[in-house]
Amino acid sequence: MASSMISSPAVTTVNRAGAGTVAPFTGLKSMAGFPTRKTNNDIASIASNGGRVQCMQVWPTTGKKKFETLSYLPDLDDAQLAKEVEYLLRKGWIPCLEFELEHGFVYRENHRSPGYYDGRYWTMWKLPVFGCTDASQVLKELQEAKTAYPNGFIRIIGFDNVRQVQCISFIAYKPPSF
């Protein structure tokens, strides 16, 4: 067998450093961009409102019963209730009305620890409004419930039938004495 060799001139450069030196790693960044001292991370240095820090109390500590979501706001009028119901319908939740004749707030009558009978479970008004597409249908049911129980508490709930959970709940009507 015959073999052929082709020779070509090659030029190589060798950088011979001293035996005691090591070439620097070129992938590191300069330390100039990093802070050299730790900054103060307390709340006063993060946000400033002109030097005054004030806290707002949003819930009175006595004389105010805790109800449901939005209960710290003034009572919702019909237009605001319609917007809340439209929101839960847009989310695809099923509206339902519940009422309570005696206690519209969490209370513990039978035991000091939380349980089934502590005011969280109310009586359902009719059936959930399956297939509801308009907020006026729910508000019509609300008016019927108000007429039937003028001294009761009424709340609107939105259920997610896919996750099988209650997603929204708010007081829609309180008796005049509250």
Curated annotation (Swiss-Prot):
Pfam families according to UniProt: RbcS, RuBisCO_small
Targeting presequence: 1-54
SMART domains listed in its UniProt record: RuBisCO_small
One of the protein's GO biological processes: reductive pentose-phosphate cycle
InterPro entries linked to this entry: RuBisCO_ssu, RuBisCO_ssu_dom, RuBisCO_ssu_N, RuBisCO_ssu_sf
Molecular function GO labels: ribulose-bisphosphate carboxylase activity
Chief location: plastid
Superkingdom, taxonomy of origin: Eukaryota
Protein location: Plastid, Chloroplast
Record's GO cellular component terms: chloroplast
Keywords: Calvin cycle, Carbon dioxide fixation, Chloroplast, Photorespiration, Photosynthesis, Plastid, Transit peptide
Stated family: Belongs to the RuBisCO small chain family.
Quaternary state and interactors: Heterohexadecamer of 8 large and 8 small subunits.
Additional observations: The basic functional RuBisCO is composed of a large chain homodimer in a 'head-to-tail' conformation. In form I RuBisCO this homodimer is arranged in a barrel-like tetramer with the small subunits forming a tetrameric 'cap' on each end of the 'barrel'.
HAMAP family with a match to the protein in the record: RuBisCO_S_bact
Role noted for this protein: RuBisCO catalyzes two reactions: the carboxylation of D-ribulose 1,5-bisphosphate, the primary event in carbon dioxide fixation, as well as the oxidative fragmentation of the pentose substrate. Both reactions occur simultaneously and in competition at the same active site. Although the small subunit is not catalytic it is essential for maximal activity.
Protein name stated in the entry: Ribulose bisphosphate carboxylase small subunit, chloroplastic
Primary gene name: RBCS
